[in-house]
Design a protein with these regions (language model features):
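A short, well-ordered alpha-helix in the C-terminal region of glycosyltransferases
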Residues: 221, 228, 235-250, 256-262
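Short hydrophobic beta-strand element within catalytic cores of glycosyltransferases
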Residues: 192-195, 205
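Conserved acidic donor-binding segment of nucleotide-sugar-dependent glycosyltransferases
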Residues: 207-208, 212-219, 228-234
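A conserved mid-protein helix/loop that constitutes part of the nucleotide-sugar donor-binding site
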Residues: 89, 98-112, 133, 212, ...
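Glycosyltransferase donor-sugar binding loop
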Residues: 94, 119-136, 152-153
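Acidic donor-binding loop of glycosyltransferase active sites
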Residues: 164-178, 191
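Short alpha-helical donor nucleotide-sugar binding micro-motif in glycosyltransferases
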Residues: 153-154, 161-166
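Carbohydrate-associated surface elements
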Residues: 54, 75
Protein backbone atom coordinates (compact mmCIF):
# COMPACT_ATOMS: atom_id res chain seq x y z
CA UNK A 1 0.00 0.00 0.00
CA UNK A 2 1.48 3.32 -1.08
CA UNK A 3 1.24 6.43 1.09
CA UNK A 4 4.10 8.27 -0.63
CA UNK A 5 2.07 11.45 -1.22
CA UNK A 6 0.37 11.56 2.19
CA UNK A 7 2.69 14.19 3.63
CA UNK A 8 2.60 16.50 0.62
CA UNK A 9 5.38 15.28 -1.70
CA UNK A 10 3.24 14.58 -4.77
CA UNK A 11 6.12 14.25 -7.26
CA UNK A 12 6.47 10.52 -6.58
CA UNK A 13 3.04 10.05 -8.13
CA UNK A 14 4.43 11.12 -11.51
CA UNK A 15 7.02 8.37 -11.45
CA UNK A 16 4.38 5.79 -10.60
CA UNK A 17 1.83 7.18 -13.12
CA UNK A 18 -0.86 7.05 -10.45
CA UNK A 19 -3.62 8.59 -12.57
CA UNK A 20 -4.78 5.59 -14.61
CA UNK A 21 -1.22 4.85 -15.74
CA UNK A 22 -0.90 8.22 -17.49
CA UNK A 23 2.21 10.29 -16.82
CA UNK A 24 0.63 13.40 -18.37
CA UNK A 25 -2.61 12.96 -16.44
CA UNK A 26 -0.72 12.39 -13.20
CA UNK A 27 1.43 15.47 -13.80
CA UNK A 28 -1.70 17.62 -14.15
CA UNK A 29 -3.07 16.26 -10.89
CA UNK A 30 0.23 16.94 -9.13
CA UNK A 31 0.25 20.52 -10.42
CA UNK A 32 -3.31 20.98 -9.16
CA UNK A 33 -2.48 19.57 -5.72
CA UNK A 34 0.61 21.78 -5.43
CA UNK A 35 -1.51 24.79 -6.38
CA UNK A 36 -4.11 23.92 -3.75
CA UNK A 37 -1.34 23.63 -1.19
CA UNK A 38 0.30 26.91 -2.23
CA UNK A 39 -2.89 28.95 -1.98
CA UNK A 40 -3.89 27.08 1.19
CA UNK A 41 -7.29 26.14 -0.18
CA UNK A 42 -7.95 23.68 2.63
CA UNK A 43 -7.51 26.46 5.18
CA UNK A 44 -10.79 27.91 3.89
CA UNK A 45 -12.69 24.73 4.70
CA UNK A 46 -14.56 25.18 7.97
CA UNK A 47 -14.88 21.50 8.75
CA UNK A 48 -14.20 18.09 7.27
CA UNK A 49 -16.53 15.13 7.76
CA UNK A 50 -15.13 11.61 7.43
CA UNK A 51 -17.10 8.40 7.44
CA UNK A 52 -14.71 6.50 9.72
CA UNK A 53 -11.94 7.05 12.26
CA UNK A 54 -9.40 5.50 9.91
CA UNK A 55 -9.98 8.19 7.28
CA UNK A 56 -9.95 10.87 9.96
CA UNK A 57 -6.56 9.70 11.18
CA UNK A 58 -5.18 9.71 7.63
CA UNK A 59 -6.31 13.32 7.18
CA UNK A 60 -4.57 14.23 10.42
CA UNK A 61 -1.40 12.52 9.20
CA UNK A 62 -1.75 14.56 6.01
CA UNK A 63 -1.73 17.82 7.95
CA UNK A 64 -5.40 18.61 8.55
CA UNK A 65 -5.93 19.81 12.16
CA UNK A 66 -7.80 17.23 14.24
CA UNK A 67 -10.17 19.90 15.59
CA UNK A 68 -11.46 20.50 12.05
CA UNK A 69 -12.43 16.86 11.47
CA UNK A 70 -15.45 14.88 12.63
CA UNK A 71 -16.44 11.30 11.97
CA UNK A 72 -19.97 10.58 10.74
CA UNK A 73 -20.59 7.12 9.27
CA UNK A 74 -22.80 6.77 6.24
CA UNK A 75 -26.20 5.21 6.84
CA UNK A 76 -28.61 2.67 5.50
CA UNK A 77 -32.37 2.61 6.00
CA UNK A 78 -32.49 -0.76 7.74
CA UNK A 79 -36.26 -0.40 8.28
CA UNK A 80 -36.65 -1.08 4.56
CA UNK A 81 -34.73 -4.37 4.82
CA UNK A 82 -35.96 -7.55 6.47
CA UNK A 83 -33.05 -9.44 8.04
CA UNK A 84 -32.68 -13.14 7.34
CA UNK A 85 -30.80 -15.31 9.81
CA UNK A 86 -31.24 -18.50 7.83
CA UNK A 87 -28.72 -19.26 5.12
CA UNK A 88 -27.75 -21.55 2.31
CA UNK A 89 -24.29 -23.02 1.95
CA UNK A 90 -22.46 -20.25 0.17
CA UNK A 91 -20.17 -17.34 0.89
CA UNK A 92 -20.83 -14.17 -1.10
CA UNK A 93 -18.44 -11.70 -2.70
CA UNK A 94 -20.21 -8.50 -3.74
CA UNK A 95 -18.88 -5.96 -6.22
CA UNK A 96 -16.48 -5.74 -9.11
CA UNK A 97 -13.55 -8.07 -9.53
CA UNK A 98 -10.90 -5.36 -9.33
CA UNK A 99 -7.37 -6.10 -8.14
CA UNK A 100 -7.72 -3.90 -5.05
CA UNK A 101 -10.85 -5.77 -3.99
CA UNK A 102 -8.77 -8.94 -3.48
CA UNK A 103 -11.14 -11.28 -5.32
CA UNK A 104 -8.36 -13.78 -6.00
CA UNK A 105 -7.78 -14.36 -2.28
CA UNK A 106 -11.40 -15.35 -1.76
CA UNK A 107 -11.06 -17.78 -4.66
CA UNK A 108 -7.77 -19.15 -3.35
CA UNK A 109 -9.41 -19.78 0.03
CA UNK A 110 -11.83 -22.20 -1.62
CA UNK A 111 -8.92 -24.56 -2.37
CA UNK A 112 -8.87 -25.33 1.34
CA UNK A 113 -12.63 -25.91 1.42
CA UNK A 114 -12.94 -28.32 -1.49
CA UNK A 115 -14.27 -31.10 0.72
CA UNK A 116 -17.14 -29.01 2.09
CA UNK A 117 -20.61 -28.43 0.68
CA UNK A 118 -20.01 -24.68 0.60
CA UNK A 119 -19.31 -22.60 -2.49
CA UNK A 120 -18.18 -19.04 -3.14
CA UNK A 121 -20.58 -16.92 -5.18
CA UNK A 122 -19.26 -13.84 -6.94
CA UNK A 123 -21.75 -11.24 -8.18
CA UNK A 124 -20.11 -10.61 -11.48
CA UNK A 125 -19.03 -12.32 -14.63
CA UNK A 126 -15.66 -13.00 -16.19
CA UNK A 127 -14.94 -10.32 -18.79
CA UNK A 128 -12.32 -10.34 -21.53
CA UNK A 129 -9.96 -8.21 -19.44
CA UNK A 130 -6.52 -9.61 -18.72
CA UNK A 131 -7.17 -9.56 -14.99
CA UNK A 132 -10.49 -11.42 -15.21
CA UNK A 133 -9.03 -13.99 -17.58
CA UNK A 134 -6.17 -14.62 -15.14
CA UNK A 135 -8.73 -15.24 -12.39
CA UNK A 136 -10.68 -17.67 -14.58
CA UNK A 137 -7.47 -19.46 -15.52
CA UNK A 138 -6.68 -19.89 -11.83
CA UNK A 139 -10.14 -21.35 -11.21
CA UNK A 140 -9.67 -23.85 -14.04
CA UNK A 141 -6.11 -24.84 -13.19
CA UNK A 142 -7.10 -25.55 -9.59
CA UNK A 143 -10.30 -27.37 -10.58
CA UNK A 144 -12.49 -24.97 -8.65
CA UNK A 145 -15.27 -24.67 -11.22
CA UNK A 146 -17.73 -26.34 -8.84
CA UNK A 147 -16.59 -24.27 -5.83
CA UNK A 148 -16.60 -20.79 -7.38
CA UNK A 149 -19.81 -19.56 -9.01
CA UNK A 150 -19.95 -16.36 -11.07
CA UNK A 151 -23.59 -15.31 -10.82
CA UNK A 152 -23.46 -12.51 -13.37
CA UNK A 153 -24.63 -8.98 -12.60
CA UNK A 154 -27.49 -8.96 -10.09
CA UNK A 155 -29.75 -6.17 -8.92
CA UNK A 156 -33.14 -5.60 -7.33
CA UNK A 157 -34.97 -8.62 -5.94
CA UNK A 158 -32.39 -11.06 -7.30
CA UNK A 159 -29.59 -9.33 -5.40
CA UNK A 160 -31.70 -9.06 -2.26
CA UNK A 161 -32.36 -12.80 -2.31
CA UNK A 162 -28.69 -13.56 -2.94
CA UNK A 163 -27.61 -11.52 0.08
CA UNK A 164 -30.44 -12.80 2.29
CA UNK A 165 -29.49 -16.45 1.87
CA UNK A 166 -25.70 -16.05 2.14
CA UNK A 167 -23.81 -17.52 5.09
CA UNK A 168 -21.56 -14.46 5.18
CA UNK A 169 -20.23 -11.67 3.00
CA UNK A 170 -16.53 -11.79 2.10
CA UNK A 171 -14.49 -8.57 1.75
CA UNK A 172 -10.86 -9.53 1.02
CA UNK A 173 -9.71 -6.00 0.07
CA UNK A 174 -5.98 -5.33 -0.28
CA UNK A 175 -6.34 -1.55 -0.43
CA UNK A 176 -7.85 0.97 1.96
CA UNK A 177 -11.62 1.22 1.94
CA UNK A 178 -13.43 4.32 3.15
CA UNK A 179 -16.84 3.22 4.41
CA UNK A 180 -17.88 0.24 2.27
CA UNK A 181 -21.62 0.20 1.64
CA UNK A 182 -21.25 -3.55 1.19
CA UNK A 183 -20.54 -3.98 4.90
CA UNK A 184 -23.41 -1.97 6.33
CA UNK A 185 -25.75 -3.43 3.72
CA UNK A 186 -24.73 -6.91 4.85
CA UNK A 187 -25.38 -5.90 8.45
CA UNK A 188 -28.86 -4.66 7.54
CA UNK A 189 -29.64 -8.10 6.08
CA UNK A 190 -28.34 -9.75 9.26
CA UNK A 191 -25.23 -11.11 7.58
CA UNK A 192 -21.78 -11.26 9.19
CA UNK A 193 -18.79 -9.99 7.22
CA UNK A 194 -15.42 -11.71 6.86
CA UNK A 195 -12.92 -9.00 5.97
CA UNK A 196 -9.24 -8.19 5.63
CA UNK A 197 -7.71 -6.63 8.71
CA UNK A 198 -6.92 -3.37 6.92
CA UNK A 199 -7.99 0.26 7.01
CA UNK A 200 -11.59 0.99 7.89
CA UNK A 201 -12.60 -2.67 7.50
CA UNK A 202 -10.74 -3.46 10.72
CA UNK A 203 -12.77 -0.72 12.38
CA UNK A 204 -16.23 -1.40 10.97
CA UNK A 205 -16.09 -5.20 11.19
CA UNK A 206 -15.90 -6.02 14.89
CA UNK A 207 -14.00 -9.28 15.18
CA UNK A 208 -16.09 -12.12 16.62
CA UNK A 209 -18.99 -9.70 17.10
CA UNK A 210 -20.28 -8.64 13.68
CA UNK A 211 -17.92 -10.79 11.64
CA UNK A 212 -14.40 -12.15 11.45
CA UNK A 213 -11.13 -10.51 10.45
CA UNK A 214 -8.24 -12.21 8.66
CA UNK A 215 -4.72 -11.24 7.67
CA UNK A 216 -4.71 -9.33 4.39
CA UNK A 217 -3.60 -11.37 1.33
CA UNK A 218 -3.57 -14.55 3.44
CA UNK A 219 -5.99 -16.92 1.72
CA UNK A 220 -5.24 -19.71 4.21
CA UNK A 221 -6.20 -17.48 7.12
CA UNK A 222 -9.36 -16.50 5.24
CA UNK A 223 -10.14 -20.17 4.67
CA UNK A 224 -9.75 -20.83 8.40
CA UNK A 225 -12.28 -18.11 9.16
CA UNK A 226 -14.72 -19.48 6.59
CA UNK A 227 -14.18 -22.97 7.99
CA UNK A 228 -15.68 -21.77 11.26
CA UNK A 229 -19.00 -21.21 9.49
CA UNK A 230 -18.82 -24.77 8.18
CA UNK A 231 -18.15 -26.33 11.57
CA UNK A 232 -19.71 -23.98 14.15
CA UNK A 233 -23.46 -24.34 14.03
CA UNK A 234 -25.24 -21.05 14.65
CA UNK A 235 -22.18 -18.86 14.10
CA UNK A 236 -23.69 -17.06 11.11
CA UNK A 237 -26.92 -16.40 13.00
CA UNK A 238 -25.14 -15.17 16.16
CA UNK A 239 -22.83 -12.77 14.35
CA UNK A 240 -25.59 -11.73 11.97
CA UNK A 241 -27.95 -10.76 14.78
CA UNK A 242 -25.21 -8.65 16.38
CA UNK A 243 -24.50 -7.06 13.00
CA UNK A 244 -28.14 -6.11 12.52
CA UNK A 245 -28.38 -4.62 16.01
CA UNK A 246 -25.24 -2.53 15.50
CA UNK A 247 -26.53 -1.45 12.11
CA UNK A 248 -29.70 -0.11 13.70
CA UNK A 249 -27.72 1.68 16.42
CA UNK A 250 -24.70 3.11 14.58
CA UNK A 251 -25.65 3.26 10.92
CA UNK A 252 -29.25 4.46 10.98
CA UNK A 253 -30.51 7.53 9.13
CA UNK A 254 -31.53 9.21 12.40
CA UNK A 255 -28.11 8.71 13.98
CA UNK A 256 -26.42 10.07 10.86
CA UNK A 257 -28.62 13.16 10.67
CA UNK A 258 -28.26 13.96 14.37
CA UNK A 259 -24.47 13.95 14.05
CA UNK A 260 -24.47 16.09 10.90
CA UNK A 261 -26.88 18.64 12.39
CA UNK A 262 -24.78 18.85 15.55
CA UNK A 263 -21.70 19.65 13.46
CA UNK A 264 -23.53 22.27 11.40
CA UNK A 265 -24.78 23.98 14.54
CA UNK A 266 -21.42 24.00 16.31
Amino acid sequence: ICEACLHGDYTKAIRHRCDKGSKAGTRLRVIAMKLYKAIKVFDDVDHFICTCEFSKNKLIEGGIPAKKISCVPTFIDADEITPCYENDKYFLFLGRMAHQKGTIYAIEAMKYLKDTDFVLKITGQVSDSEEDQAIWKYVQENKLEDKVVFTGFKHGKELEKLISRATCIVCPAIWYENMPNTVIEAYAYGKPVVASRIGSLAEIVEDNITGLLFEMKNSKDLAEKLWRFVTEEGLSRRLGMEAREICEQKYSKDTHMRKVIKILRS
